Amino acid sequence: MTEQRPLTIALVAGETSGDILGAGLIRALKERVPNARFVGVAGPRMQAEGCEAWYEMEELAVMGIVEVLGRLRRLLHIRADLTKRFGELKPDVFVGIDAPDFNITLEGNLKKQGIKTIHYVSPSVWAWRQKRVFKIGRATDLVLAFLPFEKAFYDKYNVPCRFIGHTMADAMPLDPDKNGARDVLGIPHDAHCLALLPGSRGAEVEMLSADFLKTAQLLRQTYPDLEIVVPLVNAKRREQFERIKAEVAPDLSVHLLDGMGREAMVASDAALLASGTAALECMLAKCPMVVGYRMKPFTFWLAKRLVKTDYVSLPNLLAGRELVKELLQEECEPQKLAAALLPLLANGKTSHAMHDTFRELHQQIRCNADEQAAQAVLELAQ
C-alpha cells in the first residue's frame, strides 16, 4: 500500500465454503479501507463483493484423485500463472483460503518473492500428517485458525497463528428457536424428535444409513410417537437413502428433508450423525448428539495409525473430553447407538448438562471471525 496505489489484497478460494469466507473477509476489509482492491481466484460471492476474478473458483473445485489427475496439467498451469502475475502485481498481502493442496505451495512461491502470505483455515495438521506444519511455517507469515486447539498446536511449533473464532459460531444464535424450527418442519412442539444425519458423501450414506435406521426402529419401541427427521444434502443422497430404507426399514415413517440440516438439528431433542462439520453445527444448534461412524476395515486400520487425536468429533476436541458419545466401527451398531441416544431423548440431566456445555463452547469460538481476519490482514499489510 502506497500513496499512489490502494491497498491490494490477492486471494485464492477453491470451493464454496472458501467463497463464503472470502466474501466475509472482503466485506470487513472494505468497511475499513473502502478503496481497497481485491484480485485472484474467486467465486460468485467474492465477485459480488468486488473481487476481480483472474480465474473462476470452479477451476480449482475438483475432488477425488481421478478428477485431480485429469485436471492436473490445468491446475499446475493456473498455479504457475498466478505465481507470475501475483509476483508482478506485488499485492500487500496474499490470502489463500483453505484448498491447502493448491494454496500452500502457491503461498511458498509468493513468500520467496517477498510477498506476505496468510493461510486462512488450518488444515487438520493437528490430527494427522503433522509434519505438514513445517511446510506451512515456511510458506506463510500467518495462519488464521477457527479453533483454539489449532492455535495451541501451531504455537508448539513456533508457527505464527491467530485464533479468530468460527464463522459458523457467529452465524448461529446462542439460544436457537426450537419451536420455530419445529413449526417450519411441521413437528409438534410436544413430540420427541430425533434427527438422523448419515453424512454428505456417498460412501458415508452407504455405510451408515442401515444402522441409523435400525437404531431409529429400536427407539420407536420406547417412544412410539418419535418424530424422525432425515435431512439429505442433495437429490443423489436422498435417492441413495430411500433405496437403503426400502431394504432395511420400509415401514418406518420418517420426514425426509432436502437440505435443512440446521433446522432439523435445532428442532430435534437428539441427533445421530456422522462425524465432521455436522457435529460442530449440531453443537452450535444445542442439540445433544451421538456420533456414529464406520469406514472400510483397512481405511480404519490406517486412520488409527495416522490420526494423533483422542477423539474424532469437534465437540469433544473443543471440550478436551468425551462430551458426546463416539461409537466407531464395530461399536457403531444399533443396540449401542440406541442405548446412547435414549437418555438424550429423555430430556433429563444428561441433555441439560450437554446443552449447557455446548453453549459455553459456542461462546468460546464466537469471536466475529470476519472482523478478526480483516484485522489480521491489515496488521500484516502495514
From Swiss-Prot:
GO cellular component, one term: membrane
Keyword terms of this UniProt record: Glycosyltransferase, Lipid A biosynthesis, Lipid biosynthesis, Lipid metabolism, Transferase
Highest taxon above the source species: Bacteria
Any GO BP annotation: lipid A biosynthetic process
EC code(s) of this entry: 2.4.1.182
SUPFAM superfamilies hit by this protein: UDP-Glycosyltransferase/glycogen phosphorylase (SSF53756)
Gene Ontology molecular-function annotations: lipid-A-disaccharide synthase activity; phospholipid binding
Catalytic reactions on record: 2-N,3-O-bis[(3R)-3-hydroxytetradecanoyl]-alpha-D-glucosaminyl 1-phosphate + UDP-2-N,3-O-bis[(3R)-3-hydroxytetradecanoyl]-alpha-D-glucosamine = lipid A disaccharide (E. coli) + UDP + H(+); a lipid X + a UDP-2-N,3-O-bis[(3R)-3-hydroxyacyl]-alpha-D-glucosamine = a lipid A disaccharide + UDP + H(+)
This protein's pathway: Glycolipid biosynthesis; lipid IV(A) biosynthesis; lipid IV(A) from (3R)-3-hydroxytetradecanoyl-[acyl-carrier-protein] and UDP-N-acetyl-alpha-D-glucosamine: step 5/6
InterPro entries: Glyco_trans_19
Enzyme class: transferase
Keyword Protease: no
Keyword Metal-binding: no
Stated role: Condensation of UDP-2,3-diacylglucosamine and 2,3-diacylglucosamine-1-phosphate to form lipid A disaccharide, a precursor of lipid A, a phosphorylated glycolipid that anchors the lipopolysaccharide to the outer membrane of the cell.
NCBIfam families according to UniProt: lpxB
HAMAP family: LpxB (MF_00392)
Family label: Belongs to the LpxB family.
UniProt-recorded name of the protein: Lipid-A-disaccharide synthase
Gene that encodes it: lpxB
